[in-house]
């Protein structure tokens, strides 16, 4: 019985460890000269090959009819994620560091909350304490992101960061990003979070009409692969040699990224059904901490006081938002629970749907996740 209760904790901690390692591997590949656009295309190719067979087999009897309208919506969905989001994410990571990227993207729940308010998927009542917590948490998380971007502070000295080489054996791992690169990278990372938030909103609307999550993910990966390939060919048209993959960390990043994406879909989806999306979201900062620790060894990355404080502020903001979401009326409904109407929950947001037989619960983690993840992917 105790193990049954502990399984969701073990599973999510395991996934966060995989996310952290994915951030490190991706950064190694980018440092080696791999194009972010090529990495996205190859990662989606692996994810498509992994997920499609399961979708064809497991949902062969339950998959609804695919209309042209739904297909067009999925094509737009795949533009937001993975094409735009992941290209911006990896481009931002290339200009900054793995730790900075992981920490800044922790502000995603706050940005999702803002987008949900814009699209009227989130109800805010100023008089309610939980609504106040969500608003304050959003502002705190954004403030932490700004603090990370513009305030560096003193270096926190660590004995092993004074070595001449990182664990990857290359002195270029010690390259310290310029402030201009940090600013440009931050803009790209924030834009990637915005794209992910748009993806969440559209995903919920599509799932209300096409209730086959696995098939939707497979279609999104296939279309994303095609769109990312076209984008990569256009972007790298003057240097087609970047598409060549050698049996080194660039190949590892492509395969590992795709495998983690596919595995995370199942594990996070299962954990969301077992304990709810707020439970899953609460573990996001773990990946950031693991990336920060690994980066000091692998990249000899310097740890700055300002970045640490900014990361802590972001985490505080996240938990304020998540606490507020957990207190929303009906916020803890579980899938397949009896309910008078069907709702689609986006990390605790509710969207009425035409059918009134069941409850579909998803969170922004449910589909393919960034290094991180991004936590998330």
Curated annotation (Swiss-Prot):
Keywords: Membrane, Repeat, Transmembrane, Transmembrane helix. It is found in: Membrane. One of its GO terms (molecular function) is transmembrane transporter activity. InterPro entries: EamA_dom (IPR000620), WAT1-related (IPR030184). It is a multi-pass membrane protein. It holds the Pfam family EamA. Residues 18-149, 194-322 form the EamA domain. It comes from the Eukaryota. GO terms for cellular component: membrane. The chain crosses the membrane at residues 9-29, 38-58, 64-84, 99-119, 136-156, 187-207, 214-234, 251-271, 279-299, 303-323. Belongs to the drug/metabolite transporter (DMT) superfamily. Plant drug/metabolite exporter (P-DME) (TC 2.A.7.4) family. This is WAT1-related protein At5g13670. It comes from Arabidopsis thaliana.
